Amino acid sequence: MTVGILALQGDFREHEEMLRRIGAPTLQVRLPKHLQHVERLIIPGGESTTIGKLLAMYGLIDPLRARIRDGMPVWGTCAGAILLAQRIADGRADQPSLRLMDVTARRNAFGSQLESFEVDLPVLGLGDEPLRMVFIRAPVLEDLGRDVTPLAHLDDGRVVAARQGTMLATCFHPELTPDERMHRYFLAM
């Protein structure tokens, strides 16, 4: 099972390294033709506006939507979660995006890069041991649709991980920690 990693901008190399460490073959996805060689896809963190523009520039939006609608598992981390969200709060209405997951992503929910933080929280489906979560200019997920399952909440109740069918969104960066559980969870979806 080859895991595609959208490699237009952002921290795709960190995801690639984590997947290699756990033995999963990877392919950097930059063009629509690359999608035919992958069974699942990670959309990494980075800058959601920039990644969205690059998705449009390289003709990836429609092929990605089609593959995801056909059931290809996809995981968006941070900016990737924003790009998966049907609705984007605090974003531009014309921002290129996939708009597939029935959630609202609130961009930069914690403020600037100076307000970045780490916290240990439980994640549904990962066992009892809390997961180290790294938040960097991170969004939160709001207005979850009926078919969306929240997987992790901050202490104040805000949702920072959710799943809808074969779509997974995390507002934090599991690839920046040594913990493999989120990547293994995605591979098992």
UniProtKB/Swiss-Prot annotation:
A GO term for molecular function: pyridoxal 5'-phosphate synthase (glutamine hydrolysing) activity
Signal peptide: none
GO BP of this protein: glutamine catabolic process; pyridoxal phosphate biosynthetic process; pyridoxine metabolic process
The enzyme's E.C. designation: 4.3.3.6, 3.5.1.2
Task of the protein: Catalyzes the hydrolysis of glutamine to glutamate and ammonia as part of the biosynthesis of pyridoxal 5'-phosphate. The resulting ammonia molecule is channeled to the active site of PdxS.
HAMAP family linked: PdxT
PANTHER family (alphabetical): PYRIDOXAL 5'-PHOSPHATE SYNTHASE SUBUNIT SNO, PYRIDOXAL 5'-PHOSPHATE SYNTHASE SUBUNIT SNO1-RELATED
Name listed for the protein in its UniProt record: Pyridoxal 5'-phosphate synthase subunit PdxT
Keyword DNA damage set for record: no
Keyword Hydrolase part of the UniProt annotation: yes
UniProt family annotation: Belongs to the glutaminase PdxT/SNO family.
NCBIfam families noted in UniProt: PLP_synth_Pdx2
Keywords: Glutamine amidotransferase, Hydrolase, Lyase, Pyridoxal phosphate
InterPro entries documented for this protein: Class_I_gatase-like, PdxT/SNO, PdxT/SNO_CS
Xref: Pfam families: SNO
Entry GO CC: cytosol; glutaminase complex
Catalytic activity: aldehydo-D-ribose 5-phosphate + D-glyceraldehyde 3-phosphate + L-glutamine = pyridoxal 5'-phosphate + L-glutamate + phosphate + 3 H2O + H(+); L-glutamine + H2O = L-glutamate + NH4(+)
